Amino acid sequence: MAAGSWTSLLLAFTLLCLPQLREAGAFPTIPLSRLLDNAMLRAHRLHQLAFDTYQEFEEAYIPKEQKYSFLQNPQTSLCFSESIPTPASKKETQQKSNLELLRMSLLLIQSWFEPVQFLRSVFANSLLYGVSDSDVYEYLKDLEEGIQTLMGRLEDGSPRTGEIFMQTYRKFDVNSQNNDALLKNYGLLYCFRKDMDKVETFLRIVQCRSVEGSCGF
């Protein structure tokens, strides 16, 4: 038989047997601990990037008196994520189930898919990481996939997919009462840092509950 025929036959056999091989456990399931490690690393990377970029931008462009007036004004410091129900205290956070914490993390991540484009110039001018808005978007997508996998594992063992949270910070940007571009970017960076901190915190709690010896991560 010709080499091409053998290749086609082998491919057909593999495709036919793939479901049976999966059911038989021929493809080992990735341990939950590894999935959580991967998600935590991705969340930490995003949080660190958000924190450092916010701090760099603040030191370069925002005078102290402007910073304080911004943070004390509810109209300018309000983050869109306030519309996503999240715990208001450590006690409330601990009362949430793992699935609830993952769900909230997923919504927070998805709410940033579009807004990172507004920060294109900020990332382009940053001297810290050399990333673009498309890089940050890919980081968010990677974490989204990791969280969906974790949710599926905790629910029924299969990867979970769902509709993307369609509301984003676009509304925050359009309805902003502040016409200064610097302060708009500052406000978005403030919220990005705040939201990524929440995501990392929620995932850390899930990991601590699920993996023995991981609470000191």
From Swiss-Prot:
Assigned GO CC terms: extracellular space
Protein name as it appears in the record: Somatotropin
Name of the gene encoding the protein in the UniProt record: GH1
InterPro entries, alphabetized: 4_helix_cytokine-like_core (IPR009079), Somatotropin (IPR034975), Somatotropin/Prolactin (IPR001400), Somatotropin_CS (IPR018116)
Signal peptide span: 1-24
Disulfide bond positions: 79-191, 208-215
Location in the cell: Secreted
GO biological processes: animal organ development; growth hormone receptor signaling pathway; positive regulation of growth; positive regulation of receptor signaling pathway via JAK-STAT; response to nutrient levels
Known role: Plays an important role in growth control. Its major role in stimulating body growth is to stimulate the liver and other tissues to secrete IGF1. It stimulates both the differentiation and proliferation of myoblasts. It also stimulates amino acid uptake and protein synthesis in muscle and other tissues.
Record keywords: Disulfide bond, Hormone, Metal-binding, Phosphoprotein, Secreted, Signal, Zinc
Residues modified as Phosphoserine: 132
Source organism (scientific name): Callithrix jacchus (White-tufted-ear marmoset)
Chain residues that bind Zn(2+): 44, 200
Domain of life: Eukaryota
Family, similarity comment: Belongs to the somatotropin/prolactin family.
Keyword Disulfide bond: yes
Lineage: Eukaryota, Metazoa, Chordata, Craniata, Vertebrata
Molecular functions per Gene Ontology: growth factor activity; growth hormone receptor binding; hormone activity; metal ion binding
SUPFAM superfamilies, per the entry: 4-helical cytokines
Keyword set includes Cytoplasm: no
